[in-house]
């Protein structure tokens, strides 16, 4: 019975040492995990302009000239619009229109901007 208590005490000491080492090294592992998980996206108006996401009706050149520091266009939307441009061989404006119509349709809104939900209040 004494050997059982000795084994339990050794296991307890070993676990305490492992916990202490883990606690002491947490700053290293947390920073390492964050650097692996997070990678900055190269998303700016200049990058969008260089990728052809610009037209006379959607002019982001003014943002570039004004040295706008905002992140640029939405990354998910730009990748879908670029895909539409490539797949349908259409211009940026046409692809943007197709994308916006799809987003509106997915959100139950018709092409005029009116909600298709019969419970929606549109007039007061």
Swiss-Prot record:
| Domain of life per record | Eukaryota
Q: Where are the transmembrane segments?
A: none
Q: Which UniProt keywords apply?
A: Signal
Kindly indicate whether the keyword Protease belongs to this entry.
Answer: no
Tell me the Pfam families matching this sequence: DUF2015
Q: Where is the signal peptide?
A: 1-24
Gene Ontology cellular component? cytoplasm
Similarity comment: family membership: Belongs to the UPF0357 family.
Q: What is this protein called?
A: UPF0357 protein C1687.07
In its UniProt entry, the species of origin is given as Schizosaccharomyces pombe (strain 972 / ATCC 24843) (Fission yeast)
């Amino acid at each position: 019975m004494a050997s059982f208590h000795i084994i339990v005490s050794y296991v307890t000491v070993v676990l305490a040492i492992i916990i202490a080492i883990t606690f002491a090294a947490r700053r290293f592992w947390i920073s390492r995990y964050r650097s692996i998980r997070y990678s900055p996206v190269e998303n700016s108006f200049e990058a969008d302009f260089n990728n052809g996401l610009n037209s006379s009706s959607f002019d982001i050149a003014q943002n570039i000239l004004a040295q706008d520091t905002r992140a640029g266009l939405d990354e998910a939307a730009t990748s879908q619009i670029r895909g539409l441009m490539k797949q349908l061989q259409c211009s940026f404006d046409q692809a943007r229109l197709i994308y916006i119509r799809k987003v509106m349709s997915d959100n139950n809104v018709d092409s005029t901007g009116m909600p298709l939900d019969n419970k929606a209040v549109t007039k007061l």
